Amino acid sequence: MELTLHEARVIGCLLEKEITTPEQYPLSLNSLTLACNQKTSREPVLELSETQVQIAVDSLNRKRLISEQSGFGSRVVKYKHRFCNTEFSELQLSAAALAIVCLLLLRGPQTPGELRTRSNRLHEFKDVIEVEDCIRQLMNREKPFLKQLPREAGRRESRYVELFSAASSQLETAQPESASHTVAHVAVSLDAEPLELTKRVTELEQQVAELTQKLDELIASLS
């Protein structure tokens, strides 16, 4: 399967809410939209309309990754995932693997350390080693679910990305451009730094002179 950004966000939210707030699951379109647009625990932060979420839901429904549920006496349609661990799902994941996949769908590429820190509401990992073991299991499949990204400069750990969405291919194509942009930005910053410092020193000297003058005037008025 290859999910779009919006589809991945919808699936990630349904996986998350099923675990963290089971009393509110399945989710209505309004609740699902709010979950997709959360300002915390989401990367990137999105501002999807209900129409955009509905389009993603309809697409996932056609892919048989979501099902609709209507309560007795209620006209509100609610949605639940069929992504994994249901009688209709080919994909069966352990609680640990589900937590990792869910976090990667919601927050993009992350290191094992980040995954352990952020997973406490989804699954309690004993340590980073347990996270790394689970990552290896998800990678060492006939059809891998995750892959390791090249280690970035300044990072001690490599990041991992899920392979259910188009995110990994987009990252690969974006990395060279991003790297060159970073180098250019650093070069410009280094060239501009002396000029900025000189300007700042001049401004501070002027402020000190003005304060000194005001202080002298105040002393003179009091004497």
From Swiss-Prot:
This is UPF0502 protein Shew185_1758. HAMAP family: UPF0502 (MF_01584). InterPro entries: DUF480, WH-like_DNA-bd_sf, WH_DNA-bd_sf. Belongs to the UPF0502 family. It comes from the Bacteria. It comes from Shewanella baltica (strain OS185).
